[in-house]
Regions:
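Alpha-helical transmembrane segments of multi-pass membrane transport and lipid-handling proteins
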Residues: 47-51, 55, 171-226, 256-261, ...
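Interhelical loop/hinge segments that connect adjacent transmembrane helices in multipass membrane
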Residues: 32, 75-116, 120, 124-125, ...
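Helix-loop junctions and terminal segments of transmembrane helices
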Residues: 26-27, 137, 141-185, 232-237
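Interfacial/gating helices of multi-pass transporter permease domains
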Residues: 2-3, 96-100, 104, 121-142, ...
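Hydrophobic transmembrane helix module of multi-pass membrane transport proteins
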Residues: 1-116, 321
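Helix-terminus/linker motif at the lipid-water interface of multi-pass membrane proteins
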Residues: 53, 112-143, 147, 158-162, ...
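Membrane-proximal transmembrane or re-entrant/amphipathic helices at the cytosolic face
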Residues: 296-298, 306, 317-374
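Alpha-helical transmembrane segments of polytopic membrane transporters and translocases
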Residues: 11, 71, 103, 118-120, ...
Length: 374
């Protein structure tokens, strides 16, 4: 096992040698080449891994996939990128980057430490059955939320870096991103809450029905999550890694309090609803941080957030009423799932157009002109 871990970890060392090349391509919004490199590396490493598995190499076939993926990526990144490391060293540059970077490192370490803490708490207080239900519900929730927010975040940071000195444009883009993020993520999460029964039965079967209430509350706790990730991008662009660390620290303190209360009450739903409260606290802290850095008033940020949430709630409410009128029990109908999947974005668009048509024209301008000038 020790040898396996040592060989497996070499992929991390190899990956560090093409971090700069990948960052440069990301800065230049060259996601085409990043995607091509990823596909080539995955195809080659997977092919080798499958061959090794066929010839009986067992766990080493899995190890080889990661190591070969890193090696292929390293070779191709050096081929595509013109940047090469020099053998000069500057303590002044190191000091500047270290002062900014160590706070981000601490914030990321805190996040990594607490990322799976819910599983540990549940495993200590409850049985493996409850832990399994929570893990299944949280896994599906993370797949959806991270699947949407992560790509948007990777595009957002390089765009912001080009206008970091323009306070007016940064404010405009933040308000635009705030609303778009809510209008993209919230409808999907509300859709998952309304159709949780059909989705779980379709994906996992009826044996996981007990995880559905967990899933609904976890989706509710994630509605404001994308905003937190995007706020970090804005703070990083302004060089305020100190605020990133403070936000992460306060959030973790709130989580610790939630864990203590859960430990005392021995109630799984106490933990779930505590996560909803923590997400609201996190949002309010982000509002304060953006007020400090970009001078956007609390009232204005909350007004835009509430407006976007109101549009989503109107759309999902109309859909919910319609489903209950048409179907005897929509939670058992796959046809209702298909109808909702089509109707919800249409309803969302109609409510958005009636309440905030300017946002639609801003999004259309960016898509057609491929720039950040709103």
């Amino acid at each position: 096992m020790i040898l396996i871990i040592r060989i497996f970890c070499t992929s991390l060392v190899i990956s560090s040698f093409y971090t700069i090349q990948k960052a440069i391509l990301t800065r230049d919004l060259d996601f085409k080449h990043i995607g091509i490199i990823s596909i080539i590396a995955i195809v080659i490493s997977s092919f080798v891994g499958i061959l090794m598995a066929i010839y009986g190499y067992g766990v080493w076939s899995l190890v080889s996939i990661n190591v070969i993926n890193a090696i292929i990526s390293l070779i191709i990144y050096y081929y595509y990128s013109q940047w090469r490391p020099s053998f000069s060293f500057s303590f002044s540059v190191l000091k500047e980057h270290f002062y900014f970077g160590y706070k981000l490192l601490l914030a990321n370490l805190l996040d990594a430490l607490f990322s799976n803490s819910s599983y540990v708490i549940i495993g200590k207080i409850y049985n493996s059955y409850t832990l399994g239900l929570f893990t299944r519900a949280d896994g599906l929730r993370k797949m959806v939320v991270l699947g949407i927010s992560t790509p948007l975040k990777s595009v957002l940071l390089p765009i912001l870096s080009t206008i970091q000195g323009n306070e007016v444009k940064l404010k405009t883009i933040y308000i635009f991103v705030l609303q778009i993020a809510l209008l993209l993520v919230t409808p999907l999460l509300l859709f998952l809450i309304v159709y949780a029964d059909q989705i779980f039965n379709l994906l996992y079967g009826s044996k996981w029905d007990a995880a559905i209430p967990f899933f609904k509350i976890l989706c509710l706790s994630s509605i404001l999550y994308p905003l937190s990730t995007y706020v970090v991008s804005f703070l990083n662009v302004k060089g305020r890694s100190d605020l990133v660390l403070k936000i992460e620290s306060i959030k973790k303190i709130a989580l610790v309090i939630a864990f203590v209360i859960t430990w005392i009450t021995k109630d799984i739903y106490t933990l779930l609803w505590s996560l909803v409260i923590v997400s609201i606290i996190d949002f309010m802290i982000n509002v304060i941080a953006l007020n400090i850095v970009l001078k956007i008033t609390y009232r204005f940020q909350i007004k835009k957030t509430v407006t976007a949430l109101f549009i989503n709630l109107c759309a999902i409410s109309v859909l919910y009423i319609f489903l209950n009128i048409v179907f005897v029990d929509y939670t058992k109908s796959l046809l209702a799932l298909a109808i909702g999947f089509v109707m919800l974005p249409i309803l969302n668009f109609l409510f958005l157009y009636s309440i905030n048509p300017k946002l639609i024209f801003q999004a259309k301008h960016i898509i057609l002109n491929r720039d950040s000038n709103l």
